[in-house]
Amino acid sequence: MSDDKDLRFVDSMGMNGPIFNMLKEAIRQNDLEFEWIYGDDFYKDKNKLTKELFLRLKEKLDTSSIYKTNDELNDLDIRTELTYKGKSVTSNIRTTIHGLQQIKQYCLQDNFDDLTPTFIKKRKYKGKSKEDYSSASSGIYPMRATLKEEIKLDKLDKEVLSFLNNWSHKNKYFRYKKRYSYITHDKLWRIDLTAVKSSNKNVYS
């Protein structure tokens, strides 16, 4: 393979991260989230995904014989600002409000009364040998992959109670997601095509 263009996509990911081990771990463990993500800091073209390309991809998936439509969801993710070692950081716990009606209600009241949010803690995944399996980049294609451990938390968990404490006075980071989900017929692979509107990470609300 003398030309970068000859490299297969997955092979290119293997040059910049443990992509094959990431795939094996994701298949082996149900609580891991493996994602292919558009955009890569190592890719020379920094252009963002355009609305036109997004709609073209959606049309392809809508008419695909490999994937079938799985779901269409509206979610609002909320994380809070923390101070760690004197620096402002975003919490690794997030709450998600599901459905337009509940999202509208939250926006009116800024609390979770009569709502059914979910709580998840995310962290980078490391293998048993402590090898970092958290990310891999292509460098040739505008794509990267991440592997994270997702831990579902109960609303009475100590970490959640701390996360919610003094909620109305906390600075928050919001991400509204309109998600179109597609799944293979064998249910092994899923594509989430998601339009996202988010607040500025450097400016909390």
What kind of region is each of these model predictions?
Residues 1-205:
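Phosphate-end processing signature that detects enzymes handling 5′-triphosphorylated RNA
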